[in-house]
Amino acid sequence: MLDQSTHIRHLAVVPLSLLVLVLASAQVRSEPTRRLITQAIDESKRVELPGNTHPEANTENDRGMVPDSFPMEHMQLQLRLPMEKEDELDNLLQKIQDPSSPNYHKWLTPEEFKQQFSLASEDIETITNWLKSEGFTVNVINARSVDFWGTAGQVRSAFRTAIHYFDVRGVRHIANLSNPQIPAALAPAVAGIVSMNDFKPHPIGGVR
């Protein structure tokens, strides 16, 4: 099973500015990213992406499925890097914040960051081709995610999870009822999915 909290830890704890403009001097060299997807996609072999449901998207609040035509915009497939690249990024982030480091506050441009800390291009192509084959439109490919959109029917077919209406404290929401699934061949390169629901995070001490 995939551990989403581990593999997207940088997205959760590192300021966006540091992920977009990460430390590097002109002399830093990075090895090409190792491919993670090594098997052909077999739709009969699936794995679940745990931790990808909202706690209030439960049977008590369930009000039934949305129409298949319901638009699902700006979903994001979160990508994972090989462990050696994660370690390299950890090291760079430590140096950028260390005043004693000769690389203190030396930055990569967004394009350089994408080149150094993205999946192998072959893996990204495999993932985006699979999304397109399921009828989705790919909007943006970032270093750590693929932004895409489609319909609730396409989500149910591709990810084996249905999008339902949920009434929570007088407000209607939409969300996936169960954890999504992906072909097992893609699992080494995928950490999770964001934005399959419209629940907004509450501030600390706010309503939960």
Task: Give, region by region, the residue ranges found by the protein language model.
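Bacterial N-terminal signal peptides
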Residues: V13-L23
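Bacterial N-terminal signal peptides that target proteins for export
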Residues: L2-P15
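Non-catalytic regulatory appendages
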Residues: Q27-R208
